[in-house]
Amino acid sequence: MEPRAHADTLSSNTMNRYIVLDTNCLLQSLSRRSTYYKVWEDFVLGKYTLCISNSILEEYEEIIASHMSPLAANIAIETILRANNVIRVDAHYQFHLITADPDDNKFVDCAVVANAEYIVTEDSHFNILKTTPFPPVEIKRLHEFYEELCTFDEP
């Protein structure tokens, strides 16, 4: 699927946010008992658009399977793949902005190619992006994104 402009209209109850969700943030949002379950629930409801790449999907599957179960991983991946509010990109160019953990660059590259508004992460390796002028990539902490989702729901 090709990246879409932020002006795309989804449903009237969407934030029209295009985000990249770091694996550990996704993992924290999957359990119904989690404080951050709303992040997963709002994705399923189509309230924001998730930007992914094949390498991100592979990491999601591996980490969810190892921390939860292979079945949970399969359900999460199938849910993502069937959702209409997903942008799947193939980043042909790698920016190599994160040197402390080069594996994290797949999230940055996806965000740039998909024109995502920000990456939701708790990983301190992404802090380098705050001082990188090009390409501009914003980061938000999971609690900030959660609060944004809650604020959006308020009448």
Where are the language model's segments positioned?
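PIN/NYN-family metal-dependent endoribonuclease catalytic core
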Residues: L21, T35-A65
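Active-site neighborhoods of divalent-metal-dependent phosphate/nucleic-acid chemistry enzymes
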Residues: N85-I119, S124, I128
